[in-house]
Amino acid sequence: MSDAQSARDNYQGVWGQRIGFGRKPALLMIDFMQGYTTPGAPLYAPGVVAAVEQAAGLLALARDCGTLVVHTNIRYQPPHFADGGVWVRKAPVMKDMVEGNPLAAFCEAVAPQAGEVVLSKQYASAFFATSLAPLLHAQGVDTVVLAGCSTSGCIRASAVDAMQHGFRTIVVRECVGDRHSDPHEANLFDIDSKYGDVVTRQDAMQQLRHLAG
């Protein structure tokens, strides 16, 4: 029996209940920036390249359905990066995320359109020290659908915080990515077990269509 099978057997009946979609979803596009998709860049992650390709269709459908779309990016203030606190000490590679650096620009295939909300953050969670939770509550949102990167970092942190803010949390498997499959799969397993539902893109799109009426 593999380690993955052993973990699933161990968790069965204790973790992994389904939460499902509520009545009003929002699509949260987390940190789809070119630093993750540019070969040779320090943050380059092939899994994110694949996620962008899949997320483009999900984003197009959400727009057609009138679903609220929120984009996040990471932005710091050079030269001292004081707004990055301890995180930029732990991960100095994040110092690329400054205004004007091409690596900090949105990936074109999933870039925000005029009128869509863009929130800049300095830490992993899209909810930490941002107006995201009040925005979603004000719009009556009860379900947060997550796409973006990286699975083991900002996706996981945002999924946990989404649940803690009272939202049904849905992570779209094909639309999130990481630099290696091991942390990607491990974190999807954890999220699906404890914090939300990990679903296929097909299932997510079907639910968005259904809820759009």
Curated annotation (Swiss-Prot):
EC number: 3.5.1.107
Keywords: Aromatic hydrocarbons catabolism, Hydrolase
Top-level taxon: Bacteria
Residues at the catalytic site: 154
Keyword Transmembrane helix part of the UniProt annotation: no
GO terms under biological process: nicotinate catabolic process
Functional pathway: Cofactor degradation; nicotinate degradation
A single MF term (Gene Ontology): hydrolase activity, acting on carbon-nitrogen (but not peptide) bonds, in linear amides
Cited InterPro entries: Isochorismatase-like_dom, Isochorismatase-like_hydrls, Isochorismatase-like_sf
Induction description: Repressed by NicR in the absence of 6-hydroxynicotinate (6HNA) inducer. In presence of 6HNA, repression is alleviated.
Class of enzymatic activity (EC top level): hydrolase
Annotated catalysed reactions: maleamate + H2O = maleate + NH4(+)
Role: Maleamate amidase that transforms maleamate into maleate and ammonia in the aerobic nicotinate degradation pathway.
Family: Belongs to the isochorismatase family.
Descriptive protein name: Maleamate amidohydrolase
Source organism of the structure: Pseudomonas putida (strain ATCC 47054 / DSM 6125 / CFBP 8728 / NCIMB 11950 / KT2440)
Gene behind the chain: nicF
